[in-house]
Every structure is written in C-alpha cells, then in structure tokens.
C-alpha cells in the first residue's frame, strides 16, 4: 500500500445535494454576465441543474446588493457554484 492519497471524483449533482442538505450559503456565477453573482441558499434542484435559491441576493462588481427573495435559476445560466 503506497502513501499516496487517492482523490475521488464527485458528480456535480452530488455536490449540489450536499450544499442543499447542509443549508450552506452559496455564490453562483452567471453565464455571460460576469459582473453579477447570486448569493443565497439552495432549496431544491433537478437533473438539469435548475436551482431554487432562497433568500437570493444579486451582487454586482461594485458590491452593490439587490434582494431578490426566492428565485428559480435555469441551469443553462450557471457557470459556477461556490460555497461561501
């Protein structure tokens, strides 16, 4: 047995499910809108990575915030999901 650490690949759906279960706040980067980020908590998702985001806040490049509440974000618009 070697002393190497083996890395395990986690499918994206499993990662999103973990964020959902742990009620982890997330930051979502949008496709083709690089100056806007969405922050909130994931409340649900489907196999197309459409996401229901609770307590959503839109944050722009100048750190201006706009509260959106509960939103449905289409999976095609998501570039990156990051725990915050």
From Swiss-Prot:
Swiss-Prot/TrEMBL GO biological process terms: mRNA 5'-splice site recognition; mRNA cis splicing, via spliceosome; spliceosomal snRNP assembly
Domain of life of the source: Eukaryota
Principal place of residence: cytoplasm
Alphabetized GO MF terms: RNA binding
Lineage of the organism: Eukaryota, Fungi, Dikarya, Ascomycota, Taphrinomycotina
Compartments, as annotated in UniProt: Cytoplasm; Nucleus
SUPFAM superfamilies the record matches: Sm-like ribonucleoproteins (SSF50182)
GO cellular component: cytosol; nucleus; pICln-Sm protein complex; post-mRNA release spliceosomal complex; precatalytic spliceosome; U1 snRNP; U2 snRNP; U2-type prespliceosome
PROSITE patterns the record matches: SM
The keyword Nucleus belongs to this UniProt entry's keyword annotation: yes
Function: Involved in pre-mRNA splicing. Binds and is required for the stability of snRNA U1, U2, U4 and U5 which contain a highly conserved structural motif called the Sm binding site. Involved in cap modification.
Record-stated family: Belongs to the snRNP Sm proteins family.
InterPro entries membership: LSM_dom_sf, Sm, Sm_dom_euk/arc, snRNP-E
Domain Sm per the UniProt entry, residue ranges: 13-84
Protein name: Small nuclear ribonucleoprotein E
Keywords for this protein: Cytoplasm, mRNA processing, mRNA splicing, Nucleus, Ribonucleoprotein, RNA-binding, Spliceosome
Disulfide bond sites: none
Self-association and partners: Component of the Sm core complex, present in spliceosomal snRNP U1, U2, U4/U6 and U5. The core complex contains smb1, smd1, smd2, smd3, sme1, smf1 and smg1 (Sm proteins B, D1, D2, D3, E, F and G, respectively), and is probably a heptameric ring structure.
């Amino acid at each position: 047995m070697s002393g190497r650490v083996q890395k395990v690949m986690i499918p994206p759906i499993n990662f999103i499910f973990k964020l959902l279960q742990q009620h982890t706040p997330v930051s979502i980067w949008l496709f083709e809108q690089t100056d806007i980020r969405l922050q909130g908590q994931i409340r649900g998702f489907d196999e197309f990575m459409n996401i229901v985001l609770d307590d959503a806040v839109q944050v722009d490049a100048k750190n201006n915030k706009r509260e959106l509440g509960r939103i449905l974000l289409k999976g095609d618009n998501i570039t990156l999901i990051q725990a915050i």
